[in-house]
């Protein structure tokens, strides 16, 4: 719900999502959030041996997102099984400041593109 609200109110920028959410009521946003929260996501590809470099990098992620990308608090998203490309895009946006989160900016500020790729691959391979 928080992310849909951020798109609607212009606090998170994505031209398609901003246009889609514009004009929706709080109740409509809540209904959308409940619908999407109830869906079972498909995992990109579960592997027997996950990306080792990504596994090492996840140490910076587990306090909020859990060992395998399953959040420990409803304030933070589950990232297990999320698409690798999406995770990469979001981590780079936090790193370069085009997506705002003080916590995430501090965590990823020194990540290289390779580290972002590795940790994104690791979490994309985790089951829900």
Region locations from a protein language model:
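C-terminal functional regions that serve as terminal interaction/effector modules
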Residues: 86, 107-108, 113-127
């Amino acid at each position: 719900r928080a992310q849909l609200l951020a798109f609607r109110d212009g606090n998170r920028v994505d031209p398609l999502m901003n246009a889609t959410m514009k004009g929706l009521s709080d109740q409509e946003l809540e209904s959308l959030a409940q619908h999407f929260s109830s869906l079972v996501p498909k995992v990109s590809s579960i592997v027997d041996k996950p990306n080792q470099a990504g596994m090492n990098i996840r140490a910076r992620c587990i306090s909020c997102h859990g060992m395998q990308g399953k959040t420990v608090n409803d304030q933070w998203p589950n990232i297990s099984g999320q698409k690798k490309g999406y995770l990469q895009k979001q981590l780079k946006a936090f790193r370069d400041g085009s997506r705002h989160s003080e916590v995430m900016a501090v965590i990823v500020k020194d990540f290289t593109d390779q580290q972002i790729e590795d940790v994104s691959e690791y979490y994309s391979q985790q089951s829900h």
